[in-house]
Amino acid sequence: MAWSKNNKRQGLKRLVMTSLLMAMICIDVMAGNAGDSTSCAVGRVEADFYVGACVPLGNYHDGDGKLSQLLGIDVRYNIPHTKWDAGVFLHIACAFRDYDNMGSNYQNNRTCGIGLSTAYNFRQGSRVNPFAEIKLGYAINDVVGRHRYDYGRKTGVFFSPVVGVELLSFLRVSGFADISRKGFHSAGLSLGIVVGGHKKKDKNEK
C-alpha cells in the first residue's frame, strides 16, 4: 500500500514537471519558427487574474501529496519596442499533504509570494503568444488549518519559473514551479484573464 501511495505521488510530480518541460520545448520551437525579431505595439500596462491547481514538490515527513488550489494577480508594464515586460505579482499556492489517506490527518502548507517579475513574449500582440517568465520576491510560509507538524510563520526568498501561452490577448494558460522553503514547494497549472495590453491598431489601418 505504501508503495502504491509513493508511486502515485511521484507519478503526479513527474506529470507536472514533464508538462513544464514540454511547454518550454514548444516555446523554443515556436520562437525559432517565428523568424520575426520585431516587436508589436501593444498597450503599455496590463494585468491578469488567475486561478489554478497545484501539487507539492519534494518530500515532507513522508506525506502523500494531494491536489490543491492557487490564485494570484500580475500587473505588467510592456517595455516599448521590445518583447519584454516587467511587473509585480501576488501569488498564493498551497502544498497539501495527507498523512493517513483518510482526510482527517493532513497539513496544508501555504506560500504567499510577493515580488517582481519579467517575461519575454515570443509573439507579442499575436493571437497566440508563448511566453517565458521569471518571478523573484519575498515568501511568507505558514500552515492553514490543522497542524500535524508545528511550523509557525516564516519568511524567505520566493522564486518561480513560469512558461505558458496567451490566447487572443485575454486568456493566459501557465505552468509553473514555486520554490521557497522545504515542504512548501509546489508546481501546477493556472488559467488567467488578461485586462489591457492589447495590440494597438496600426495608424495606416482604416
Which residues does each predicted region cover?
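Gram-negative (and chloroplast) outer-membrane scaffold detector with strong preference
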Residues: 69-146, 167, 171, 192-199
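Short glycine/proline- and aromatic-enriched beta-strand/turn motifs that initiate or cap beta-hairpins
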Residues: 31-86, 187-200, 206
